[in-house]
Amino acid sequence: MSTNPKPAFRRILLKLSGEALMGEEGFGIDPKVLDRMAQEIKELVELGIQVGVVIGGGNLFRGEGLAQAGMNRVVGDHMGMLATVMNGLAMRDALHRAYVNARLMSAIPLKGVCDDYNWAEAISLLKSGRVVIFAAGTGNPFCTTDSAACLRGIEIEAEVVLKGTKVDGVYSDDPVKNPEAVKYDEMGYGEVLEKELKVMDLAAFTLARDHDMPILVFNMNKPGALRRVIMGDHEGTLIRSSRKTAE
């Protein structure tokens, strides 16, 4: 039960990994997981939260892996972008089935499949209460979907980038391998870099830091965690500028 009557955030960018959609499966999309995530997003919409979503594509394709096997990295990344579009289509469909208005925008044109990304239109849709799913990353190779999440978050003026992962925050070490690893509740950008903690890739993280975009890492597989994050309850790890953490 939340101790805060009002949501802590009004406009968010939710970053989900493609792997999160797999559930217990080794590949693809688990329909049960997809529907549960759609229901959790629906709860936010009902609270009046404006929700942007970026989904990775690792459950369907990883360009980096095939690049190591000899495939051209640009080609591999283009295939990875298309994988995020497939995940976006699945999420849009799940949201529609949950009676949530959602729009899918792609950074690469896919006429007849989804809309082209348009910054002004995205903000207008968010203000009207629609969920906006941003697909195809940034539209450029060599850029991760974490970079896309931070970029879109900054563009739509989100108050925070929520990074849904398999662990419930940022730890001093891998909690799976080291049971004595310590979980951080709040950190500054500099502290994360100093400790070399792997929150997201460096390009994405420094983009967020340079534009003072807070990042909140939490466990998306934990039922109710997303709502608790939104309500400002102690959930996950919040990373923001050190001057704010000191206040």
Swiss-Prot record:
Record-listed E.C. numbers: 2.7.4.22
Q: Where in the cell is it found?
A: Cytoplasm
- Give coiled-coil spans as residue ranges: none
Q: How is its activity regulated?
A: Allosterically activated by GTP. Inhibited by UTP.
Please provide an example of a Pfam family that matches this protein in its UniProt record: AA_kinase
What InterPro entries would the database entry show?
AceGlu_kinase-like_sf (IPR036393), Asp/Glu/Uridylate_kinase (IPR001048), Uridylate_kinase (IPR011817), Uridylate_kinase_bac (IPR015963)
| Cellular component GO terms, alphabetical | cytosol
Offer an example of a GO molecular function term for this protein.
UMP kinase activity
Residues of the region (Involved in allosteric activation by GTP) are 23-28
Q: Which residues bind ATP?
A: 15-18, 58, 62, 165, 171, 174
Q: Name one GO biological process term.
A: UDP biosynthetic process
**Keyword annotations from UniProtKB, A to Z:** Allosteric enzyme, ATP-binding, Cytoplasm, Kinase, Nucleotide-binding, Pyrimidine biosynthesis, Transferase
Pathway(s) of this molecule: Pyrimidine metabolism; CTP biosynthesis via de novo pathway; UDP from UMP (UMPK route): step 1/1
Fill in the subunit field for this protein.
Answer: Homohexamer.
Assigned protein family? Belongs to the UMP kinase family.
Q: What is this protein called?
A: Uridylate kinase
State the organism named in the record: Shewanella loihica (strain ATCC BAA-1088 / PV-4)
